[in-house]
Amino acid sequence: MTDTSPEQRVHDLLVIGGGPAGAATAYWAATAGLDTVMIERKTFPRDKTCGDGLPPRAVHQLDEMGLGAILEGYHRFDGLRAIAHGRTMEMAWPDHPVYPSYGYVVRRCDLDAFVADHAVGAGATLLQGTEGLRPLDPPSGSPKGAIGGAVVLDKASGNEHEIRARHVVIADGANSRFGRVLGTTRDRTYPMGMAIRGYFESPLHDDPWIESSLD
């Protein structure tokens, strides 16, 4: 059953997806005083297959959000060590007037949780275990292609309800389910990579390089 109460509140912004992109969006919107709601279909802390490496530009963005002190508790790396066909190259991050010359390795289960918490601390509302199902029609007179929010599913109860918003940011990943409802598709002629991720102990755990083997 979907709650369609006509007196339902209209938020300034609905963010669909609580990963780093969605949570950063929610943080900056809430900081600017916007009434912001962010939904995430899983519950934090939750994992995601990823290399866990934050390059300098990502470090800069997180530092701008006030998260630099948290990052300092994680492993710092200064560049990339590439190994291919018996050759090894160590490539340091270049000096830049804005971005730092280092990155950090942060597990996604940690990163996603503390960025989302930071958005909540700034005033955003986070609904975990909530999945965006389909868009709502916008008010009359809205620009072509606009949507007025989303019908969402509370996965714990199985109930659907509407979240209305003046603006919607869809940040639920490359395989966006909500995006597919809007008509986005993946070009199957474009190359796609697959990944397997695992954690293990290594004598190189404190090495200042992240290592990539290209053989």
Question: Which sequence ranges carry the predicted segments?
Answer:
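Beta1/beta-strand and adjacent pyrophosphate-binding region of the FAD-binding site
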Residues: S5-A21
